[in-house]
Amino acid sequence: MAKPRHYIFLLAALVVFFGCSGIRFSHLSPEAQDFHPQSMAIFDIGAGGYEEAREAVDRIVTDELTAKGWFQKVLSVQAVQGLFKENEVLRKASADYLAKFNAVNFSDPELSKKISEEARIDALLLVNIDYWYYTKEEGQNVAKVGLGMRMIEAKTGALIWKAMHHLSADYRFSKPELKSVATDVVKQMVGVMPH
């Protein structure tokens, strides 16, 4: 009887070990099961001190989401900002929503619904740049990029999915481009994103 327990324990340990080989953190809300957005806006990119990376990350995330073909419409941060110029109601609702979200980590359902109606989108994607630099780790030169993403159901303001991931690329002489490391990070994160 003791042998089957050992096998069960070993099997469970292997599942845990190999099951953790994806992105570093991903949390899916129960509502995600029934949420299948047709349109998404990359609503904000929090640069966290890495302003030079904001435009590149916007392009990389937009391109990856578009390439997946999961959504009929994907709006980049630049496209959303273009809508702000045309629509004062959307601009004000968005500014108020982001101020509240950033100040108290609260997704206001009324403001989110207003944004959904004005921009005609189903989901908001908020992106944070956590790392974007070259450094030395354990004596090795590395290019390091880390991102966080949160998907919000625009009509209700519900947090559907959040994830964090980072990758490091070792190098000796020639530095890898941070954009290419970021592309790998985004591909892995989008790969586990609900759709």
Question: Which sequence ranges carry the predicted segments?
Answer:
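Bacterial N-terminal signal peptides that target proteins for export
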Residues: 1-9
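C-terminal/domain-edge helix-coil "capping" segments
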Residues: 20-41, 59, 106-107, 111-122, ...
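Acidic/histidine-rich, surface-exposed loop or edge segments in extracytoplasmic proteins
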Residues: 36-48, 93-94
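N-terminal segment of the mature soluble domain
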Residues: 48-120
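Short aromatic-hydrophobic micro-motifs that form the base-stacking/packing surface
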Residues: 125
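Generic short beta-strand segments
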Residues: 128-133
